[in-house]
Amino acid sequence: MLSKFKRNKHQQHLAQLPKISQSVDDVDFFYAPADFRETLLEKIASAKQRICIVALYLEQDDGGKGILNALYEAKRQRPELDVRVLVDWHRAQRGRIGAAASNTNADWYCRMAQENPGVDVPVYGVPINTREALGVLHFKGFIIDDSVLYSGASLNDVYLHQHDKYRYDRYHLIRNRKMSDIMFEWVTQNIMNGRGVNRLDDVNRPKSPEIKNDIRLFRQELRDAAYHFQGDADNDQLSVTPLVGLGKSSLLNKTIFHLMPCAEQKLTICTPYFNLPAILVRNIIQLLREGKKVEIIVGDKTANDFYIPEDEPFKIIGALPYLYEINLRRFLSRLQYYVNTDQLVVRLWKDDDNTYHLKGMWVDDKWMLITGNNLNPRAWRLDLENAILIHDPQLELAPQREKELELIREHTTIVKHYRDLQSIADYPVKVRKLIRRLRRIRIDRLISRIL
């Protein structure tokens, strides 16, 4: 059993977090990507004071164009609006994985700026590390006036369900002046005005090697840049705590670590990529040993955004969903006893050829973590991540919380035995060969740390 002292240490961490009081009527849950798109467009069109869009990317496709056009239109209608977009510096200047870097998102931002003279919608490129593989802007949240529309989604056709296919995420709108001010000021001070951050809608922007030293210093500064605010809520009322972090010792990571053992009945986790840091796996095993329930909802390998159908040309990146499945199979084989007793429930999400991008945690009925953090080594060490921790001690959000989980579970099947998952021997020949080659040179471990 977890000693009283240790449990108190975890609970103490949560109790001491500064909390901002939140009205239950000012929290909206959305349950589908199309609703998220419509809400975002409505909020942009009705904004009175500020629009700050932060995302990994804003893609040059129908979905992304709809958003950028709406931002230009809002600025044209109300020139006094403070409108800004922040995306990852490296991601914006390359093609999609496996495609050449011609006509990139950054080129599109430049064209939009040239086609709209006198309408300033700055797009800032944020370099979290000198190379994309070593860290990206994974901070989430669209701050519009006194609201934060929060999702792990980026902005493109599938995330916005612009056409047939969708990528499933979580979507919440929180109206809270204090929290939106804290997030807006932090983004302005620590990201927008950060060294190494340059406008992508400027054709004369520097090349990455020219700002390498600035990027390194910027990353160092971000490690120490937490939100600083006084809470105004106690531990008995509905509250929100914004969190931000870069690096394994961040307050966000510490909070995730302390949140899990506070489950008295049940912990539920969603992640699209099953590659949990060892420290979180230990937390899960400890909960199971104490008789607590753990539910993990992950995407089926075919619902992974890196999955390549067998009838399409194979690329190395297409091995990733199989590596995640190997991780899950290994995890389940260790814990099959708890699967047999229904104490550990693992669900695989699959809905036709749509993809799964959900992340977050639910601890009992009282805590909810909404985040873009994939709960993997990459999120733990390399990317700039953030989250909003919701404390609901009076269960005021219970109906929405239950509905959200019910809908997430709708397209899932429960894994009853680790052998229900394919083993390497069952994989397509090219995948099998690649994985065995990676294992021979021990590079699979390195890959798991950066993916």
Swiss-Prot record:
The record places the active site at 138, 169, 357, 385
Recorded E.C. number(s)? 2.7.8.8
List, alphabetically, the InterPro entries matched: PGS1, PLD-like_dom, PLipase_D/transphosphatidylase
State the Gene Ontology BP annotations: cardiolipin biosynthetic process; phospholipid biosynthetic process
Q: What is the effect of changing residue 273 to A?
A: Reduces the enzyme activity
Q: What does this protein do?
A: Catalyzes the conversion of cytidine diphosphate diacylglycerol (CDP-DG) and L-serine into phosphatidylserine. Essential for biosynthesis of phosphatidylethanolamine, one of the major membrane phospholipids. Phosphatidylserine is later converted into phosphatidylethanolamine via the action of phosphatidylserine decarboxylase psd. Associates with the bacterial membrane for its role, which depends on the levels of anionic phospholipids in the membrane.
What's the protein here called? CDP-diacylglycerol--serine O-phosphatidyltransferase PssA
Q: Which organism is it from?
A: Escherichia coli (strain K12)
Q: What is the lineage of its organism?
A: Bacteria, Pseudomonadati, Pseudomonadota, Gammaproteobacteria, Enterobacterales
